[in-house]
Every structure is written in structure tokens, then in C-alpha cells.
């Protein structure tokens, strides 16, 4: 007698949502493959996604944008890639380091190295001040933003950045020269320090082409809840590139 038991079809397993961190790992692996160098650490993501990006990233090599390098991103290192020997490529501004930044969607934010997701104590150490409480640090940041901004700029733009946006498939090689005259801008905050519980964004006041003044958000500061001790600082990168365009050279890959 035949077995009349039927095999039920296996339900489709929903595809896991790709996190921003996963996008970053895939992007770094694609840079490694473009240079033909080992990826520093375990890699458990889609090699097919890596292979889609690698041909465009080979322009880093063929266009002499950044020299031969090694992947140095593990264990919280400051730089994602470090050049072999001194100096950099013709587009590297003489830096021996390269940062890889990514976002899933256009209009995203990028964090500075070292202080972008640090403990408040580390943030204060970099500023040369004593840490007391989050409330006092919020007040200090808002009262001394022209001291804070150069430090954040340095930890973000002191080396070239290769920046990838997944949804638009956009890859840009970004180098900065000098820094803005922060004292020439007027600033406003979305929340003053006494009303700042989670996050507050810094806006600069600029004039548009018609001479009208408007506020543009360039930076977000976030203090996490008690379950997480670190703070987060992120540039609104597309607006930063536009508002301070005179300080950037951008190459589309």
C-alpha cells in the first residue's frame, strides 16, 4: 500500500532586514576585494552583495585615489584602512588612512571616529574638560559649540572618506581641505540643554539663493537612556557637503 502522506511545502523564510552595520561590513569587504587584501575579522554576510560593489571601488586603485593599504577596522580602531608606507594617493590629501562610511538610505548621518559613539567621559577627555553629569555636558556643548565643532570635524574629515548609500547605489570618495570658519555662522538648537532629554540637533542659519534665511540641521547629539551609557554624535552628511562645499572635493565612483 502506497504511503499517502504528502509533504507540506516549506514556507518561504522572510529575508532578514539588512542593518546599517551589515551594510557597512559588506562595503568594507568590497573595498578589501578591490585592493585584493584580507578582511580584518569574521565576515558572515552576502558575498554577492560584495561582488556588486567591488568593480566600482577598484577606481580607488586605478584612479590613484588611495594607495595600497590594509584593513584595520577591528577592535574599535580609529581608521578602517591604513596605507602601506607614508603619504597617500593624489586624491587622499596626503593622509595615510581611509574611512568607510555607509547608510541604507539617502539623507542619513555619519559619526566621527573615536568620539562618534563614545562614553561621555571619553568625549570630555578629548575636549580637555572634566566630566561631571550628562546635564552639565549638554550645557557645555551648547555654550561652547565653536570649541566642540573643530574636534568633531577633525575626527571625521582628517582622512578621506569613501561613502556608500545602499538605496541609491551611490558611492563617493570625499576629501576635505581645511575647516569652516565656525565663528562666521549663527546657530540654533532644536532643544535647549534644560529641555534636552534624548537628542538635540544643531542648525546653522544660512541664506538661500533668494536672500531668505533658513535653518539647516548639520549635527545631532544624542544621549542614550540609562540602559546604554554611550552618547552618539552624527553629521547630516549631505547637508554638510552642500553647506561647506568649498572645503570638499567629491568624486563619484
PLM features: residue spans?
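Nucleic-acid endonuclease domains
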Residues: 2-253
Amino acid at each position: 500500500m502506497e504511503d499517502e502522506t504528502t509533504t507540506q511545502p516549506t514556507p518561504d523564510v522572510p529575508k532578514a532586514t539588512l542593518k546599517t552595520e551589515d551594510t557597512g561590513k559588506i562595503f568594507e569587504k568590497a573595498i578589501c576585494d578591490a585592493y585584493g587584501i584580507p578582511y580584518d575579522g569574521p565576515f558572515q554576510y552576502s558575498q554577492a552583495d560584495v561582488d556588486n560593489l567591488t568593480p566600482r571601488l577598484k577606481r580607488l586603485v586605478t584612479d590613484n585615489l588611495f594607495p595600497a593599504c590594509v584593513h584595520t577596522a577591528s577592535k574599535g580602531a580609529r581608521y578602517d584602512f591604513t596605507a602601506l608606507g607614508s603619504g597617500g594617493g593624489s586624491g587622499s590629501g596626503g593622509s595615510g588612512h581611509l574611512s568607510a562610511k555607509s547608510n541604507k538610505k539617502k539623507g542619513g548621518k555619519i559619526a566621527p571616529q573615536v568620539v562618534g559613539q563614545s562614553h561621555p567621559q571619553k568625549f570630555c577627555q578629548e575636549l580637555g574638560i572634566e566630566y561631571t553629569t550628562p546635564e552639565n555636558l549638554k550645557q557645555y556643548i551648547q555654550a561652547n559649540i565653536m570649541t566642540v565643532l573643530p574636534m568633531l570635524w577633525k575626527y571625521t574629515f582628517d582622512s578621506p572618506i569613501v561613502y556608500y548609500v545602499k538605496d541609491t547605489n551611490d558611492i563617493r570618495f570625499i576629501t576635505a581641505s581645511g575647516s569652516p570658519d565656525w565663528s562666521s555662522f549663527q546657530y540654533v538648537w532644536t532643544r535647549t540643554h534644560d529641555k534636552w532629554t534624548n537628542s538635540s540637533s544643531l542648525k546653522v542659519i544660512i541664506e538661500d539663493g533668494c536672500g531668505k534665511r533658513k535653518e539647516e540641521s548639520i549635527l545631532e547629539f544624542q544621549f542614550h537612556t540609562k540602559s546604554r551609557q554611550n552618547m552618539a554624535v552624527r553629521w547630516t552628511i549631505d547637508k554638510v557637503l552642500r553647506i561647506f562645499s568649498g572645503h570638499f572635493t567629491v568624486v563619484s565612483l
